[in-house]
Amino acid sequence: MNMKTRPKVGMLLIGAKRFRELGQGTADGTYESRKLGEAERYLNRFGEFADIVYDGIVYEREDVQRTIDLFFKERVDCVFAMYLSWAEDFTWIHFLRDMPPVPIFFSSVVRDRLDIVDT
């Protein structure tokens, strides 16, 4: 990484495939639409200080491989990884197994409260 330029950060945001349609027809929308909004907030914030490499929320094995290929092609300096909610571990395990060596910053956001009333 050149210290005079912005870092190139790969964003690995993991979601739960089984929840994608959950919440359909509710005022807050589906799980997927809510997680897309959350992802957008993280991308905007990171975009203030880094060049972001992102190819969407990772839900399944094919998403993991596509994301790894993109991160490798773009030569990311590091990866920011985060579960957007509970999700199966297989995507994370495949990422750790198959991603070439790169610094990984794992984040776990703890919310003060959950506003879930209707899913």
Task: Enumerate the predicted regions with their spans.
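Metallocofactor- and cofactor-centric catalytic cores in central/energy metabolism, strongly enriched
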Residues: N2-T119
